[in-house]
């Protein structure tokens, strides 16, 4: 009997037709995907001379918004070394994005498999999957052009990646929190780089611009999905989710933002530099906290910021003020970056 009740509740949560505002939001996102979408091989002229990847191109030097780019150790390296490190770093960020979005696509396919006929979520999830497939091709093409043999996600996460999408069917709330935990750090980092206005290599600038433009819809959907589903959970479920939320944010952030072991060995970067960068210095801790201002806003708005959850956010070192609105620029951080 209990199992039947759980299945009925699960199926009822899949039906969203009774929420006109939510359905309208899904229609808006779906129409946005139709009207404004990108193809990695028609919207990026990979063969253009200006897109050529050449040695000693200073546009690959890491910007000040990157924690390594503003560190004295990096700035003390020769220009050639800075370029080499920058190319490897940016290629690995693209590979990490590729790996994460591959997991996301598989999860969305598992989630939509169980959707009832007529669900407006089905259409939008498929639009998002198509866009993410294009992103993975775009990221891989960038890695190929740069020429660095980068690993992407840490090995342990690559090994468990086939299991993660299986969560999307029975535990979609947990899955979409994981989606945000992966999307928010990448989106935050890329927006800061574009806002800084530094001269970037055209490949990197175009790839980032396309990704940020389409990722805005994906993050909006994940936020609205959770705003709709979280109130339907039982009190005990919301409590456990409130603890899972910050733990997932921090653990996936580490996997996505911190370069893999191969990076530190390849360039013989001192251990104390790594410690300062991730996240031993006050500046790096602020950068970490800033990434999750939108996530904290969502936790506040959905009642997940209870006293114990606040403690977990603090222990994870990602506590702080929530955003006033989504994608609010962290102006103090941006202002300080060029001076670093």
Swiss-Prot record:
It is a multi-pass membrane protein. It comes from the Bacteria. It holds the Pfam family AurF. One of its GO terms (cellular component) is plasma membrane. The chain crosses the membrane at residues 162-182, 239-259. Gene3D superfamilies: Ribonucleotide Reductase, subunit A. GO terms for molecular function: oxidoreductase activity. Disulfide bonds: none annotated. The keyword Transmembrane applies. InterPro entries: AurF/CmlI, Ferritin-like_SF, RNR-like. This is Uncharacterized protein Mb0909. It comes from Mycobacterium bovis (strain ATCC BAA-935 / AF2122/97).
